[in-house]
Amino acid sequence: MADAFTVALTLLSARELSETQLRARLTRRKLDPDDIDTAIARLKQDGTLDDRRVARALARMESSIKHRGRTRVIQKVRQAGIDADVADEAVSEVFEDVDEHALLERALERRLRGKAPRDLDDRNRARIVRGLMAQGFRLEAILKKLQ
């Protein structure tokens, strides 16, 4: 049976993982908990495992590629098992370079499908607002754009 360090390196070679994600995957493989702790400590020491780097990469992907708002990006980063302070710091760092209003504008245009906001009935307006809020945009910003 492979040791925890080798398995961890194999998993990390496929994609970046947070410490929590890596620990869960190693545990599912029924590896010795002490070996898992040792492997994770070694990976953290040599910089192979870095939750800050994972948080920044995940925040960049969620904001730039998936066009999510700040709230949803923070939620996604925290779901990866990253500490709340590290997640908030990474998202703030990424959103320094992101125009949230442009993100919202683009998401709204996709949802409107060429219609003007004033042409929406109440049902469709509510549907669009719920969808944009689920993407992590603030209600105040959404309502302002819909006026």
Residues of each region from the PLM?
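An alpha-helical, amphipathic repeat domain used for nucleic-acid recognition
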Residues: 1-147
